[in-house]
Amino acid sequence: MLMSKLADVFKNHKVFIPFIVADDPDFETTVKNVVALAKGGADIVELGIPFSDPVADGPVIQAADLRAFAANVRTKTVFDIVEAARKETAVPIVFLTYLNIVFKYGYDAFLKRCADLNVAGLVIPDLPYESRDEIVPIAEKYGIDIIPLITPTSGHRIEKIAKSASGFIYVVSSMGITGERDEFFAGLKALVAEIKQYTNVPTAIGFGIHTPEQAQTMAGIADGVIIGSAIVDLVAKEKQQAPAAIEKFTKQIRVAVDAKKQISVK
């Protein structure tokens, strides 16, 4: 397998990964939002491909998907957004997508297009571990990481998921769907410690984080922090003025995350 571009991002510092939905509220604003996140200090940008049945997502992200559908989003639109953003930023990008989107486009064609645009990885919430072999070999051919999710209920599956991981591991902070919350799984630190027994692949915690204080706490537990709903909510409120607002928010999170001791991922 090719060396992971994403794992390299985690070397020597804590990583911040903001999430936005592609084509929300429109094409041009999404391109500007990606650039704004990079300017604000994002290490990796997670770009959601809208889907009609997003089982992992809460109401904020579901509403963003609906706004994107109203803007007539297609999978090609998402690739075109990345192509336009690439004229202004080289920030690593990962897609959050559901398996049917990739399947309908064609695994090889989808992953080749990702490689052409320097999309470094895919997060696929509805990809069962047992089915990963239908896509991972093709992803490896193009040097793209299929980023696994580990949840508080992964249990005995943690070892095999961790040992087969590449890029980074998306650690789900609590059960349920995405969305802002004030309480997280009490065993999160122990969960990350267990993952670390099996792999040197970095971990990033997501689901529910929405304040600099929470981000700082999570950066003390894992190698990176993922924030989605709080940023998507800003996009909903600010619409075409969102780039300035999310750049400001990203800078605040960057400061909070950087306050944690720098680490070196082996």
Curated annotation (Swiss-Prot):
GO MF: tryptophan synthase activity
SUPFAM superfamilies registered for this protein in UniProt: Ribulose-phoshate binding barrel
InterPro entries xrefs: Aldolase_TIM, RibuloseP-bd_barrel, Trp_synthase_alpha_AS, Trp_synthase_suA
Catalyzed chemical reaction(s): (1S,2R)-1-C-(indol-3-yl)glycerol 3-phosphate + L-serine = D-glyceraldehyde 3-phosphate + L-tryptophan + H2O
Key word Amino-acid biosynthesis present: yes
EC numbers, comma separated: 4.2.1.20
Pathway: Amino-acid biosynthesis; L-tryptophan biosynthesis; L-tryptophan from chorismate: step 5/5
Active-site residues, Swiss-Prot/TrEMBL: 46 (proton acceptor), 57 (proton acceptor)
Entry keywords, A to Z: Amino-acid biosynthesis, Aromatic amino acid biosynthesis, Lyase, Tryptophan biosynthesis
GO cellular component, one term: cytosol
Similarity comment text for this entry: Belongs to the TrpA family.
General function of this protein: The alpha subunit is responsible for the aldol cleavage of indoleglycerol phosphate to indole and glyceraldehyde 3-phosphate.
Protein name: Tryptophan synthase alpha chain
Provenance organism: Lacticaseibacillus casei (Lactobacillus casei)
Encoding gene, per UniProt annotation: trpA
